[in-house]
Design a protein with these regions (language model features):
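PRPP-associated nucleotide enzymes
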Residues: 1-121
């Protein structure tokens, strides 16, 4: 349970964003839906001010990806600005079902490859 008294008396430090990596999209959507609903309900009792800008958003998910090259190497791409936000990254490093192609062959992502994608973002 959230301590609502503490939340109602405090001012947010920075807006938040969520980066849900491959294999965590469903969890990211669930967390996002909860945060959107919770913060909208909390903002009903607040007055709007500069400190509260970005507190209640339609979505906290960011557009990010880790595209793979033909060699199996990848790069992290964030398609929007995250300057000045608190970024939370969701990654399931034990998800073996995510695949990518290397030299025409299907390869399953190992925990190390998931961790490398986490570091790239």
């Amino acid at each position: 349970m959230a301590n609502l008294d503490l939340l109602e008396k405090s001012i947010p430090v920075a807006p938040i964003k969520i980066a849900a990596l491959k294999g965590c999209e469903e969890l990211g959507k669930t967390v996002n839906d909860y945060l959107v609903q919770f913060r909208k309900e909390l903002m009903e009792h607040r007055t709007n001010g500069i400190a509260w800008s970005g507190y209640a958003e339609e979505s906290f998910l960011i557009d990010c990806d880790c595209p793979r090259f033909g060699t199996g190497e990848a790069k992290g791409v964030i398609n929007e600005s995250i300057r000045g936000v608190d970024l939370f990254i969701l990654c399931d490093i034990t998800n073996y079902s995510i695949t990518y192609k290397v030299n025409g062959y299907e390869n399953h992502m190992s925990p190390d490859e998931h961790f490398q994608d986490l570091k790239r973002i």
